[in-house]
């Protein structure tokens, strides 16, 4: 039987409402903890290991990209062997996951032009 293993985080209220509706219609609402808010805050309150991460934010702006900021917060919480997907290919994010010192193995996939798949190895 399915057991809840972690939350779904989303910033946009409409996407949260759609996710809740879709999960309810599928009979899965009891298995997902949907948290609305900025991932840079909500990720700090997970309270356990993370099994899978999908980073699909907005690239751009000055300073570290949103993907890089999120990865620096969540990386210590990802279990060894845990996969991470990012579909924007921000250069500072790629530098992080491709640096062996940060504990990931990473490769680009030919999807959407800039999808990166990573596995936490240490």
What are these regions (language model features)?
Residues 13, 41, 57-60, 89-91:
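Short, glycine/acidic-enriched loop or turn micro-motifs at the edges of active sites
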Residues 1-3:
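Conserved SAM-binding loop of SAM-dependent methyltransferases across substrates and taxa
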Residues 48-57, 83:
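Short SAM/SAH-binding signature in class I
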Residues 12-52:
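S-adenosyl-L-methionine
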Residues 5-10:
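Conserved SAM-binding motif I beta-strand of class I
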Residues 61-122:
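C-terminal substrate-binding/active-site "lid" region of AdoMet-derived donor-dependent transferases
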């Amino acid at each position: 039987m399915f057991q809840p293993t972690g939350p779904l985080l989303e910033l946009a209220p409409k996407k949260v409402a759609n996710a809740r509706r879709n999960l309810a219609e599928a009979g899965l609402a009891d298995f997902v903890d949907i948290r609305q808010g900025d991932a840079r805050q909500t990720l700090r309150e997970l309270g356990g290991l993370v099994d899978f991460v999908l980073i699909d934010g907005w690239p751009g702006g000055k300073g570290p990209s949103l993907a890089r900021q999120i990865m620096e917060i969540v990386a210590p919480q990802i279990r060894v062997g845990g996969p991470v997907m990012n579909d924007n290919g921000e250069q500072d994010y790629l530098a992080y996951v491709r640096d062996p010192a940060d504990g990931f193995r990473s490769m680009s996939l030919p999807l959407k032009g800039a999808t990166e798949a990573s596995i936490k190895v240490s």
